[in-house]
């Protein structure tokens, strides 16, 4: 890998593992990062592998990712596989000195996630969790406006409402991600963790949480409906009101653009995010005004895969820390676990510093 501050024109050599539904967004994003060349990928399903080759022109496919590591000697690996596989793959990459970007959920449990992060730290490799929601352009713009004092010097509340509509009926989740049906934990583990991380990004440290979780669709194993309450160190309150069963007030493909509607209130006004990505600012006593900022429908959800992978690339090139490093993401996962504990005990749970 080119050293920090290097003027070398050599591209970073990357490899990917996985060829499922979501991996296509990540393969496409890598093709738009000029400092990166994906030299090979690994997948054991020949049909899915053929799809990746046909769509992205990647002709080197390995059934064994360890052989790929040893043969290609990449600078980094992008792990786009189900959570139970992450620990073994990360360990093999770390012991070879390969930098890692790994999809979330990071592992099947917080304990396993801690071991994954510790392995990478001992090996001295950079480790980033591919947590892309905070990189969605509307959340970056909302963060900028909060920091600029657009809604005052005190944050009052954050309230996000999500209705995804892909989880009702006997065939729920089968078209895209059928394994969701068998997750014993679903809504918070798979989707809510995005918003836990985003709320931390926007409002800072979380000190206490309360959660109510339930299952609306009897054909799945995990929860698909929840109300999550956050208390922040700065005095603000947060709420995530979500279910994957009911539908939003827009065509279903549109629901996966912003994943819902957002209201952020402060001492001098409020910000609103709409389903189409529009942001408005309303000062106290004033009219609602549209905020002009760039966002588009390329890639996934505002092109957040590209933006997250661009961030990882920049961190590799400059040796700067990743926003969603392993150590930082463990804090998000601890809050996730606290949400499940709260739902189980039917009471608030304090977040230890």
Which positions does each model-derived feature cover?
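Beta-loop-alpha module in the N-terminal Rossmann-like domain of NAD(P)-dependent dehydrogenases
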Residues: 45, 56-119
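C-terminal helix-rich "cap/oligomerization" subdomain common to oxidoreductases
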Residues: 1-11, 76-81, 283-286, 312-353
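N-terminal Rossmann-like dinucleotide-binding module
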Residues: 1-56
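Hydrophobic residues in well-ordered beta-strands that form the structural core
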Residues: 102, 127-129, 159, 240, ...
């Amino acid at each position: 890998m080119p050293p920090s501050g290097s003027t070398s024109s050599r591209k970073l050599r990357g490899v990917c593992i996985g060829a499922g539904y979501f991996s296509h967004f990540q393969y496409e994003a890598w093709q738009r990062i000029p400092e990166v060349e994906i030299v090979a990928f690994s997948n054991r399903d020949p049909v899915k592998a053929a799809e990746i080759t046909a769509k992205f022109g990647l002709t080197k496919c390995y059934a064994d990712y360890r052989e790929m590591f040893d043969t290609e000697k990449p600078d980094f690996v992008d792990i786009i596989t189900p959570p139970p596989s992450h620990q073994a793959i990360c360990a093999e990459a770390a012991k070879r000195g390969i930098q890692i970007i790994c999809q979330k959920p990071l592992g099947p449990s917080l304990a396993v996630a801690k071991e994954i992060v510790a392995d990478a730290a001992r090996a001295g490799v950079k480790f980033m969790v591919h947590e892309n929601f905070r990189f969605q352009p509307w959340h970056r713009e909302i963060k900028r406006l909060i920091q600029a004092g657009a809604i005052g010097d005190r944050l009052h509340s954050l309230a996000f409402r999500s209705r995804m509509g892909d989880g009702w009926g006997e065939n729920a989740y089968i078209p895209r991600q059928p394994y969701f049906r068998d997750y014993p934990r679903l809504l918070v583990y798979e989707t809510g963790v995005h918003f836990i991380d985003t709320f931390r990004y926007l409002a800072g440290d979380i000190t206490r949480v309360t959660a109510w979780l339930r299952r609306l669709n009897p054909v799945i194993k995990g929860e698909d409906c929840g109300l999550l309450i956050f208390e922040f160190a700065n005095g603000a309150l947060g709420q995530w009101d979500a279910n994957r069963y009911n539908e939003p007030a827009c065509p279903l493909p549109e629901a996966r653009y912003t994943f819902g509607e957002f209201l952020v209130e402060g001492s001098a006004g409020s910000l609103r995010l709409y389903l189409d990505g529009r942001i408005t600012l309303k000062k106290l006593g004033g009219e609602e005004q549209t905020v002009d900022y760039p966002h588009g429908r390329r890639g996934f959800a505002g092109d957040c895969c590209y933006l997250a992978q661009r961030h990882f690339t920049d961190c590799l090139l400059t040796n700067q820390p990743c926003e969603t490093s392993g150590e930082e993401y463990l804090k998000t996962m601890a809050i996730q676990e606290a949400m499940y504990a709260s739902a189980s005990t039917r009471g608030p749970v304090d977040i230890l510093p």
